[in-house]
């Protein structure tokens, strides 16, 4: 199957849409005189024209004004600052609160309770600040059996070497090191 390029696809789409819409424009009364002769125009005007028994009438300004008033629906804009009663006392997003509505005494009590329950971030992550020194009781206790980073790295390397040479064979790297050492020794 052949793949159609984008330009050809667009050209095909435009041609198809213009062909399909040309049929609808041709049946319109305004386009007929351009495509047909004046002889056939009478036939179309009789079919689509105004019946001979009715007269055209113009709409007066008063009728137009009355018609417009009946069909227009007036909508008031929604109030922007209206808050539902149930959500009036809730804090705003991201922990901000409206301070104007609270008394100073209530604000002090709330701040004291928050400080005791939630330490500041430097305290939580083991860093000390100048204003709040830590006591040894506040410091996280390190388990006695945990290894230091250098000891842990040494254990991992030893296990890796045991996996690489399980039968006591030396690894390639060890053999190269010994060869280099033998070459460096002076011959006697």
UniProtKB/Swiss-Prot annotation:
The gene is Npvf. Residues 116-144, 163-188 are annotated as: Disordered. It is found in: Secreted. Belongs to the FARP (FMRFamide related peptide) family. Residues 27-57, 97-106, 128-188 form a propeptide. Keywords: Amidation, Cleavage on pair of basic residues, Neuropeptide, Secreted, Signal. One of its GO terms (biological process) is negative regulation of gonadotropin secretion. One of its GO terms (cellular component) is extracellular space. The keyword Thylakoid does not apply. The modification Phenylalanine amide is found at residues 94, 125. The keyword Iron-sulfur does not apply. It comes from the Eukaryota. One of its GO terms (molecular function) is neuropeptide activity. InterPro entries: FMRFamide-related/fGRP. Residues 1-26 form the signal peptide. This is Pro-FMRFamide-related neuropeptide VF.
């Amino acid at each position: 199957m052949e793949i159609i390029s984008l330009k050809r696809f667009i050209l095909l789409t435009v041609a198809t849409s213009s062909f399909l819409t040309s049929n609808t424009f041709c049946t319109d009364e305004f386009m007929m005189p351009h495509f047909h002769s004046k002889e056939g125009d009478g036939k179309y005007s009789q079919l689509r024209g105004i019946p001979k028994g009715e007269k055209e009438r113009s709409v007066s300004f008063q009728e137009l004004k009355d018609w417009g008033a009946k069909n227009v629906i007036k909508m008031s804009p929604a109030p922007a600052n209206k808050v539902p009663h149930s959500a009036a006392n809730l804090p705003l997003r991201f922990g901000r609160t409206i301070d104007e509505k609270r008394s100073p005494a209530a604000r002090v009590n709330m701040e004291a309770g928050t400080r005791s329950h939630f330490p500041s971030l430097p305290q939580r992550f083991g860093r000390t600040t100048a204003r709040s020194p830590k006591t040894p009781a506040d410091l996280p206790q390190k388990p006695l059996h945990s290894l230091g980073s250098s000891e842990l790295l040494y254990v991992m390397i030893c296990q890796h070497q045991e996996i690489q040479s399980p039968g006591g064979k030396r690894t390639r790297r060890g053999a190269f090191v010994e060869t280099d050492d033998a070459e460096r020794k002076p011959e006697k």
